[in-house]
């Protein structure tokens, strides 16, 4: 990946901070309340066992246990609502940050390799990474808080060796996970890379399927199969690495905790209250042992998600090709203004020519591969917000298309299925005209860079579009590449 030395790299922690908001803090507070209620239930179960030995157990005690444990479930469910809010806010902040950091990087617009690498993060990967990270944070904290508060109750109400057993099991299990963290992170990073590579192939599916060309479809399917197989292999390797360690740590955790419980029972063989408390809390302690295993194994899951967040961060500020302007062949380009034609040797010379007049049209001409579009992109990257750039194949947002789904945007020359049916969406030419009308009506730039603005227009619409471009040229400078004027 090309590194942009002019812009410092984004760290995963910076992106994680985007989750810090009011809903996130409410989620944390609710999780503490949930864990306290769960620990209170454990205390009441122990108390009920002791009351049973004294024939003092009341129905009220059972109802109280039911009520407090139910309240714990309700509070836990509510916390998920705030987790969802925090996730959506984090993703929204990410998109705003990405837009702010890259709005001046016009040179990257036509970089297909970069687009294939970065676009999956914009279209879904980052959204799922944030939610996976939130779910890991909430899940792990819920387990940790529940363990801490319940272990305190067990230690104070049954035997002080139980907290020591849980602490020892936690240290052993965590150490096992820690020693494997790098191997698991590498496996998941490779899994992410292969999955993105596979899903990026889908961006070209539409053209290869619906053109009906067997040659192109065969090549596309062959490439997809290779990427699908590589993605599956990487995912299986990542899962097996994590789950193998998970199974081993679960067995060790059970052995430590239940060995200690057996030792406590043996030392208190004549203490009915202690034995009943152990039996009464056995389901809870099995749950706690499972939760401890989940928490320590979840640490590597957290690291795996954190690694994926690192992938998001690494693609937050993609660097343009340093040899971008080498694609421009000045000796093969002509800049025509009215009846005069000029050639330029550098982008700076082209900028000087553009700023020589405040209005008027400059037509960029040259053979295919001479760098006409690259010149316009380079002009935009240097002139920045003083120029409005309309590239050849655009997915720019316009008012006329805001209420439409993406698949409704372009139907080419497709005809209605039945006589009298209204064709949904716009044809390429209709979209071109509406976009140009919006540009004329709602934008106010010093310079307009129009790349093949007439590419999809019939003669009548081309004349109308030319009039709109002429209107722009009366109030601003227009640098254009015309489809009609291709050499």
Describe each model-derived feature in a short phrase.
Residues 18-19, 124-133, 213-258:
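An intracellular "coupling" helix at the cytosolic face of ABC transporter transmembrane type-1 domains
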């Amino acid at each position: 990946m090309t590194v942009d030395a002019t812009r410092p790299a984004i760290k995963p922690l910076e992106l994680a901070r985007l989750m810090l908001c009011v809903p996130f803090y409410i989620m944390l507070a609710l999780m503490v309340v949930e864990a306290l209620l769960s620990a209170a239930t454990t205390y009441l179960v122990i108390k009920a066992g002791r009351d049973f030995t004294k024939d003092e157990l009341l129905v009220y005690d059972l109802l109280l246990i039911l009520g407090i444990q139910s309240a714990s479930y309700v509070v836990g469910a509510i916390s998920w609502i705030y987790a969802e809010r925090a996730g959506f806010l984090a993703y929204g902040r990410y998109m705003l940050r990405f837009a702010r950091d890259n709005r001046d990087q016009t040179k990257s617009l036509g970089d297909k390799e970069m687009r294939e690498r970065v676009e999956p993060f914009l279209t879904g990967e980052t959204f799922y990474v944030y939610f996976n990270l939130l779910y890991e944070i909430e899940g792990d904290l819920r387990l940790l808080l529940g363990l801490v508060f319940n272990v305190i109750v067990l230690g104070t109400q049954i035997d002080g060796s139980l907290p020591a057993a849980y602490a020892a099991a936690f240290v052993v299990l965590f150490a096992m996970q820690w020693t494997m963290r790098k191997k698991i992170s590498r496996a998941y990073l490779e899994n992410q890379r292969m999955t993105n590579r596979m899903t990026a192939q889908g961006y070209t599916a539409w053209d290869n399927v619906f053109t009906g060309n067997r040659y192109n479809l065969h090549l596309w399917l062959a490439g997809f199969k290779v990427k699908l197989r590589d993605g599956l292999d990487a995912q299986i390797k990542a899962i097996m690495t994590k789950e193998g360690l998970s199974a081993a740590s679960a067995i060790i955790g059970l052995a430590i905790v239940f060995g200690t419980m057996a030792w406590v029972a043996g030392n208190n063989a004549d203490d009915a209250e202690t034995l009943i408390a152990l039996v009464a809390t056995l389901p809870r302690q099995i749950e706690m042992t499972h939760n401890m295993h989940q928490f320590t194994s979840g640490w590597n899951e957290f690291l795996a998600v954190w690694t994926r967040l690192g992938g998001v961060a690494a693609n937050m500020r993609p660097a343009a090709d340093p040899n971008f302007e080498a694609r421009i062949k000045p000796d093969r380009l002509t800049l025509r203004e009215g009846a005069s034609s000029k050639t330029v040797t550098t982008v700076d010379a082209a900028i000087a020519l553009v700023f020589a007049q405040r209005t008027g049209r400059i037509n960029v001409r040259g053979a295919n591969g001479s760098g006409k579009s690259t010149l316009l992109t380079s002009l935009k990257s240097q002139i920045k917000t003083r120029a409005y750039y309309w590239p050849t194949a655009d997915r720019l947002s316009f008012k006329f298309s805001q209420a439409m789904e993406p698949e409704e945007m372009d139907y080419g020359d497709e005809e209605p299925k039945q006589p009298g049916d209204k064709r949904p969406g716009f044809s390429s030419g209709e979209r071109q005209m509406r976009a140009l009308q919006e540009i004329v009506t709602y934008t106010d730039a010093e310079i307009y860079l129009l790349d093949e603005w007439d590419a999809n227009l019939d003669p009548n619409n081309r004349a109308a579009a030319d009039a709109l471009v002429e209107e722009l040229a009366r109030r601003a400078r227009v640098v254009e590449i015309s489809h009609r004027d291709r050499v």
